[in-house]
Structures are given as C-alpha cells and as structure tokens.
Amino acid sequence: MQINDTFLDLNNYNRLVIPTTNTHLLLAGRTGSGKTRATLFLIAKSILQNPDADFYFADFKNGSDYQFAINTGHLTDMQAAIDDACYALSSRQAGVPDRYPYVVILDEYPSFILNLDSKMKKEYQSKLATLLNLGRSFEIHVWVITQRPGAELFANGSRDNFNCRIVMGSPSPETRRMMFGDDISEVPADWLNNNVGQGLIYRDGIGISHIAVPKINWQKLNTFGRLQEIT
C-alpha cells in the first residue's frame, strides 16, 4: 500500500521519493516550523510502505504527538528506546536471523542528553554512535528529531552517518551549516525563507531539495495502532 502524497519539490513541483528503508534520519526545526508535521508524515508513509517494520517511539517532552502509539507497547522513554535498539543490534550481530527494519524515533534526543550527568551522557552518546555507525548493516535505523542538531551531542562524528537530513522552516545560518555543511552555499537564497511546512532535505547521492510537507491524514497514521493490535 502506497501513500499518494510525498514531499513536494518546490523547485519543479515533482513528488520526491523519500527513502523509507536503510535510512538514518536527522530532522531539525524551530518550534512552529512544521517539524512535527514532517515527522508524523514520514512515520505514516513508512508504516504503510513497510508493514514488516518495527517502530519504537521516544518523546522526551512527553507531548501528545505520538498518541497513536499509546497502548501499543511501542511508545517508551528515551533511555529504554536506545537500550532496546542496542540489544536488537547485538542480537543481530550474534546471528539472530531478524532482518525486518527496526526503526527507533528519538524526539528531542538532545534535551535527553543534556539532562544526564556526565557519566550517563557519555554512555548514551556512545550507544547512539554505535547504532548510527553499525545499525544500517543490520536493518536498524535511527531517526533523531530536534530543534538544534549540534555536533557536540553526537559522539565520534556520528552525526555524519545521517544519510537523510531535513530542516523545516527558516533555519539560522548556524543550523544550516550544521545540517548541510558546504553544500548549503549552493542553495538559492529564496529556499531559505520558508512558511510553516516548508524546508530543505538532503539525501546522500542526490543533494539538497526545497520541499513542502503534506498535511497529515490521521486515519492513515492511526493504522499503526490497528496493525499492532493484529500483530
């Protein structure tokens, strides 16, 4: 089953094909930029196009964005989400034949990290770095949702392992550099002033595109809860 709507390329009004497997995703944006809309759209699209995928959600701000996952056993705290993903990685490295996509979505991971003491901070930065460095080979994928994607929050240069990066709204020059590096210098100036639900996406091997995000069809997203009841 396919979702008809995808991100719209504002440069040529073509539909973009967003990678739904073998992807580590970093999604950034200020409050009110459309970051949540983009996140939920990608979740809905991925769930419907990858029915065998196993999704887990952690929201440090404990908001209502992931209400569709309540009572499914797939909405957990940030620490447990990272620990469980690391356990899944270790199991697959040891030969457990699970090869379905395992996707862990960490909303406001930086706030979680900054709330830890020094020892725990290093431990969980290291765990996330391991997932980012090794996970894709074992069908384990990390999505990090944040307002500010500072490199200091990701150990050992692991931020570079995000092969799909999205910035919603009109990001600051600092955020643009953090997300896109030197590639941002090639972006037209009018791509940097965006309305709610508009932004930039970088995909490995493709580069940067100017995008708009469709509004969420909650009926499609709520399919997640029904799928979990069946399985």
Task: Identify the residue ranges that each predicted region occupies.
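Phosphate-binding and hydrolysis-coupling loops of NTP-dependent motor/remodeling domains
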Residues: 1, 171-231
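P-loop NTPase catalytic phosphate-binding loop
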Residues: 1-103, 110-171, 212, 219-231
